[in-house]
């Protein structure tokens, strides 16, 4: 349809008045929608006017189209279908004239040649460029438009070159397609200097330089130098070998020369078999403190040993050290082996002694692990987020109990109330105060005192008996017993001492002190039975009970109670430490009596008899 209608009209076609009316009617709707001319739908036949009849659908494919009503409408030119402000289409003759008219020097700076405008090219071309370049309707104006110089911003040649390079290096970004674009390459080389050479990529150039040329002459040159270092290395590492090998230096050089001449690879085992010396002898010589005395005692053995050590060490140890010198010391595999070899003592020269030390260490480690496992306690209580978890000591009564056990809580409640009621001291009208201190006072209770006083003393004695482990038995002479109570500033009974009259006592036999082994049962030594002599000694005051509240211990409460009892037990006399005796002391009481009397041979008596 388009190829048949694209005919140039006659020169007077545009001057025809009838055509002017038709073109004005046809072009007016096209000019209002100039920006939609790139849409392919706009290239179809022009909009029909009301005078044109509607197209009827064909019944058959071979049926001819209906004839037009007016014969004048067939004379319309192809230019009426396009905007007259875009005469960008150039005929082949115009393109040839344009190419010949332009000068050759301006080829490098001219813009790229524009392709002929077809229907497809007009669709792709953006509409913004069309509005910037209004042209005349005549085709000759196209040539003038190309030759006229356009006003542009002044830019230097270097700026233009850099702009071209940046435009070429920028990678196109596409969001509609799913294909991934390659990374942009930085172009370096001749493109910056405006030469005709092809630009090269920076990445290709660096990849070519990374391959070094193989050199085969360096190993042969460094080989004799390394052998010289291996010979001198043992003397630098071990001061023992340096001191001993000074005497036999010529022999070492001869053997080294022989080895260089033969250059036969011999393993350390073969060399050891040839000289008849094992590896352990070499290690012992390295560990020896006085090599000169050993060489003087056995010169023949020392010579043979030194030869083998000189042959083996440069070949074996130094080569490994040279290879491992490039590795950080802690990552080497040779050093832990050397440390294990040097661990035995200096005087051990047998292979069994060298291997026995690691076994003993392993056995000791296993024993330590077993002991640690025995000491660890198993968890028998589930931690479910309780506020109070595990064993707890009451701050008031001092009882140790488990808070998450109902039975322990019940027992603690009963004991706590009974204990507080017992040790609470409300005060009496007639108090027999025998001593006063900054943190409390000591009250003496006699058997002839009122009932409230004797009842209070009896209650405190029962608590003391329960904590000390005694049975609830009566005193041997209750009529002569005296009770001393220590009352603190909070008006609580925190200490009790029961003293009675005695006539004789027995001295504890002194036992030899042994070194205690805490891993065995010796840590229970103070819980063991004690022995006393059968020879009675004279004593006047017997300490039947002495008890201190658990939360008030280590505050000299028992010492002050005993000092007060010595001063007030007998009227008008002060008893010495040799005149008092303790009745069947507990382990803690034995320690206290030894410290108080300043001797382990203190006096004891049995309060039951």
Swiss-Prot record:
The keyword Transmembrane does not apply. GO terms for cellular component: chromatin; chromosome; nucleus. GO terms for biological process: bone regeneration; fin regeneration; heart development; mitotic cell cycle; mitotic sister chromatid cohesion; regulation of DNA replication; sister chromatid cohesion. Residues 13-22, 41-54, 345-355 have a biased composition (Polar residues). It holds the Pfam family zf-C2H2_3. Residues 214-230 have a biased composition (Basic and acidic residues). GO terms for molecular function: acetyltransferase activity; protein-lysine-acetyltransferase activity; zinc ion binding. It is an enzyme of class 2 (transferase). It catalyses: L-lysyl-[protein] + acetyl-CoA = N(6)-acetyl-L-lysyl-[protein] + CoA + H(+). Keywords: Acyltransferase, Cell cycle, Chromosome, Metal-binding, Nucleus, Transferase, Zinc, Zinc-finger. Its EC number is 2.3.1.-. Residues 1-71, 100-165, 197-241, 314-357 are annotated as: Disordered. A zinc finger (CCHH-type) spans 392-416. It is found in: Nucleus; Chromosome. The N-terminal region seems to be responsible for association with chromosomes, thus excluding any involvement of the Zn finger in this process. Belongs to the acetyltransferase family. ECO subfamily. This is N-acetyltransferase ESCO2.
């Amino acid at each position: 349809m388009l190829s048949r209608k694209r005919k140039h009209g006659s020169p007077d076609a545009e001057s025809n008045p009838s055509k002017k009316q038709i073109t004005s009617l046809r072009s007016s709707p096209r000019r209002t929608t100039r920006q939609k001319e790139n849409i392919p739908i706009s290239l179809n036949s022009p909009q029909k006017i009301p005078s044109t009849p509607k197209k009827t659908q064909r019944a058959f494919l071979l049926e001819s189209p209906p004839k037009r009503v007016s014969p004048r409408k067939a004379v319309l030119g192809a230019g009426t279908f396009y905007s007259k402000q875009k005469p960008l289409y150039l005929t082949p003759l115009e393109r040839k004239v344009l190419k010949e008219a332009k000068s050759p020097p301006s080829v490098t700076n001219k813009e790229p040649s524009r392709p002929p405008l077809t229907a497809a090219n007009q669709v792709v071309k953006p509409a913004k460029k069309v509005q910037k370049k209004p042209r005349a309707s005549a085709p000759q104006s196209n040539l003038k438009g190309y030759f006229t110089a356009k006003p542009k911003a002044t830019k230097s040649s270097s700026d233009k070159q850099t702009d071209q390079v940046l435009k070429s290096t920028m990678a196109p970004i596409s969001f509609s397609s799913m294909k991934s674009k390659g990374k942009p390459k930085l172009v370096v080389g001749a493109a910056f200097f405006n030469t005709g050479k092809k630009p090269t990529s920076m990445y290709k150039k660096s990849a070519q330089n990374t391959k070094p040329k193989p050199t085969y002459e360096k190993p042969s040159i460094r080989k004799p130098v390394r052998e010289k270092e291996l010979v001198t290395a043992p003397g630098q590492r071990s001061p023992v070998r340096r001191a001993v090998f000074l005497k036999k230096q010529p022999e070492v050089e001869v053997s080294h020369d022989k080895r260089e001449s033969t250059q036969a690879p011999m393993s350390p085992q073969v060399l050891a078999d040839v000289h008849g010396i094992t590896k352990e002898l070499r290690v012992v010589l390295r560990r020896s403190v006085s090599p000169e005395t050993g060489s003087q005692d056995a010169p023949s053995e020392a010579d043979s040993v030194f030869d083998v050590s000189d042959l083996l060490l440069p070949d074996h140890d130094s080569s490994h050290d040279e290879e491992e010198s490039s590795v950080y010391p802690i990552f080497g595999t040779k050093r832990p082996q050397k440390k294990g070899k040097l661990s035995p003592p200096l005087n051990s020269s047998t292979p069994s002694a060298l291997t026995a030390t690691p076994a003993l260490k392993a056995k000791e480690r296993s024993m330590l692990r077993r002991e640690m496992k025995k000491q660890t306690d198993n968890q028998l209580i589930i931690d479910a987020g309780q506020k109070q978890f595990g064993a707890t000591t009451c701050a008031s009564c001092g009882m140790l109990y488990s808070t998450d056990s109902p039975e322990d809580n019940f027992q603690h409640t009963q004991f706590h109330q009974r204990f507080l009621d017992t040790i609470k001291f409300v005060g009496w009208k007639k108090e027999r105060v025998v001593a006063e201190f900054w943190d409390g006072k000591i009250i003496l209770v006699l058997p002839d005192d009122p009932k409230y006083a004797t009842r209070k003393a009896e209650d405190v004695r029962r608590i003391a008996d329960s904590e000390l482990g005694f049975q609830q038995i009566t005193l041997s002479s209750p009529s002569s017993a005296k009770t001393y109570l220590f009352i603190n500033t909070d008006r609580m009974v925190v200490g009790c001492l029961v003293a009675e009259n005695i006539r004789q006592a027995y001295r504890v036999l002194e036992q030899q002190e042994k070194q205690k082994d805490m891993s065995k049962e010796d840590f229970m030594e103070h819980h063991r039975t004690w022995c006393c002599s059968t020879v009675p000694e004279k004593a006047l005051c017997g300490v039947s009970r002495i008890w201190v509240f658990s939360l008030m211990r280590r505050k000299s409460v028992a010492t002050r109670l005993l000092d007060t009892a010595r001063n007030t037990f007998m009227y008008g006399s002060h008893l010495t430490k040799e005149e008092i005796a303790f009745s069947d002391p507990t382990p803690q009481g034995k320690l206290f009596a030894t410290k108080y009397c300043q001797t382990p041979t203190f006096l004891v008596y049995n309060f039951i008899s």
